[in-house]
Amino acid sequence: MPGLGRRAQWLCWWWGLLCSCCGPPPLRPPLPAAAAAAAGGQLLGDGGSPGRTEQPPPSPQSSSGFLYRRLKTQEKREMQKEILSVLGLPHRPRPLHGLQQPQPPALRQQEEQQQQQQLPRGEPPPGRLKSAPLFMLDLYNALSADNDEDGASEGERQQSWPHEAASSSQRRQPPPGAAHPLNRKSLLAPGSGSGGASPLTSAQDSAFLNDADMVMSFVNLVEYDKEFSPRQRHHKEFKFNLSQIPEGEVVTAAEFRIYKDCVMGSFKNQTFLISIYQVLQEHQHRDSDLFLLDTRVVWASEEGWLEFDITATSNLWVVTPQHNMGLQLSVVTRDGVHVHPRAAGLVGRDGPYDKQPFMVAFFKVSEVHVRTTRSASSRRRQQSRNRSTQSQDVARVSSASDYNSSELKTACRKHELYVSFQDLGWQDWIIAPKGYAANYCDGECSFPLNAHMNATNHAIVQTLVHLMNPEYVPKPCCAPTKLNAISVLYFDDNSNVILKKYRNMVVRACGCH
């Protein structure tokens, strides 16, 4: 008789509860699955510590193995403000050209064909990225690969952007006739075809990336060609806005990047000298004053991304924005003849969207970022409203937690906690990741402190003193002992792409402190 056995089990539990004065009560029999679901779950957690309950969620949902409840509008707004403060952003970016939700392949291909005739030249279809975001995505994937090599678990690895694959070599192939995805930055060897090395093959770029706290790409702001004098009629102008750099960031390296196609026809055997100049001063009736920044000598048959060092002028533009008058590019053949950049295979703003010229700068913070202190009055009001409804639940919990039973408490350990940028409604400006496993520490630091608790010597001494004077000395606290950084790739208000490292964002290990 299964019903009689279940009834006897509950009677034994109640008898133990009545006799609790003689010792701790036995564990309550497990609830059925339906009853457990009705009891509710923890927000974005893995169940936490036994004996600790949460307020039943109004509408629990499950995503990626996490049980959570739908946030109210005010709660969501408060959480957005707090996370933006952690990210060092004064407000939510609203880029002009943000991201759109991915669509099924058949529908996406149909819409792309319909919109291809309406898009301005050089503009990508919805859901696709230009050359600068693609390059930044390669940098992000390189950082994510480094994090994986450091031993991060599967639950802690950041999720790549769904619109593009995890790496350049795995990115889906474009339709015939379309531009190839960005998969290299250096010039390819003559006759090497469309294959090539990864954008991070050079040791210099790897050093820049490892040393930087933030990487930022800038789009070319020039929309129309400027008329130059006959001597400079083939010059091309580029301008970038560096006025929105966060305070405390110093430029460690900066590059101007422009794509070169293979040259055929009358210039197929030619060698070109490509020069990049800083515009020092503009004049109405004569040529502008120029300062040579960098040069490259290339063959007509070479193809790939050209890089020019503009670190010096970038630092000047950040410190004194009024001196930012842009760059000029010139192309000269080995015979000393000035030619149009298009004749040398250089792709301008009218070229394919994934071959647009852009600028990238590496930054390192010169001072520690301090979060802005904001008023918590709204949270206090919300807490005061909930305090009366939670007081009875807290009383019931405390009555059970008063028992010093090892079965009712768990040792200090790491628990799962996932932060979803998509659930916060930020999928239009955060390129990657969709979210990350932040995790948290919780549990008891009771005597004896085992080796797996990662206790400090001070925590061991504090535990011993707590045993002698529990009213005056508290137990050690369960806190993170190892924290990892994450990288976030996002658009700013000017549609520039920023790759930023945020330290101490992921809990890797916990211990008693």
UniProtKB/Swiss-Prot annotation:
Ranges in coiled-coil conformation: none
GO terms assigned for molecular function: BMP receptor binding; cytokine activity; growth factor activity; protein heterodimerization activity
InterPro entries, per the entry: Cystine-knot_cytokine (IPR029034), TGF-b_C (IPR001839), TGF-b_propeptide (IPR001111), TGF-beta-rel (IPR015615), TGFb_CS (IPR017948)
Major site of localization recorded for this protein: secreted
Disulfide bond among keywords: yes
Pfam families named in the record: TGF_beta, TGFb_propeptide
One annotated Gene Ontology cellular component of this protein: enzyme activator complex
Regions of compositional bias (Low complexity) in chain numbering: 98-121
Source superkingdom: Eukaryota
UniProt region (Disordered), positions on chain: 38-66, 89-131, 145-200, 373-398
Result of altering E112Q: In IO; associated with disease susceptibility
Effect of R257H: In IO; associated with disease susceptibility
Reported impact of L96P: In IO; associated with disease susceptibility; some patients also carry a HFE variant; decreased function in positive regulation of SMAD protein signal transduction; results in partial activation of hepcidin expression; affects post-translational processing resulting in reduced amount of the mature form; results in impaired secretion
Proregion residues excised on maturation: 21-374
Post-translational modification: Glycosylated at Asn-454. Glycosylation is crucial for recognition by the activin receptor type I/ACVR1.
Signal peptide: 1-20
Keyword terms, alphabetized: Chondrogenesis, Cleavage on pair of basic residues, Cytokine, Developmental protein, Differentiation, Disease variant, Disulfide bond, Glycoprotein, Growth factor, Osteogenesis, Secreted, Signal
Disulfide bonds: C412-C478, C441-C510, C445-C512
Name the UniProt record assigns to this protein: Bone morphogenetic protein 6
Native source organism of the sequence: Homo sapiens
Name of the coding gene: BMP6
